Amino acid sequence: MKAIHVNWTKPFFEKHRLRGHGFETLKNLNSKTYDQLDYQLLYTMASAANWKKHNGPIKLYTDSVGASFYQRFGLLDLYDEVDINFLNGYSKSNVDAAYFWTSGKIKCLAHQTEPFVFLDQDMIIRNKIP
């Protein structure tokens, strides 16, 4: 079964306004360009590679900023398919990315027409799922 990762970067650029647990490390990144911590890249790699090894294809939904960032590290090669158009289009909407920071993910999930497994990028499946 196909799995999906989603990386919508628009909330990163509103990081000073993000509310909720887990955002302190993001707020402390001083970069004005999109960035992730090293451990985030590593768990993304582990998640995609383990899914492919044990369960099948994996697709990434991201935007142009996320695709450029992942390309720098060779991460796009981990995916069987990469879609930047969907989230590029969604990023043009008036949604408040700081308040609705998971909405890019939810829109991608609602966009699916076939069975799939959604994986947060820090979810690592190390066996075949039944």
Task: Please report, for each region that a protein language model flagged, where it lies by residue.
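Short phosphate-binding loop-to-helix
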Residues: 95-111
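Amphipathic coiled-coil/heptad-repeat helices and related helical stalk/stem segments
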Residues: 44, 102-105, 125
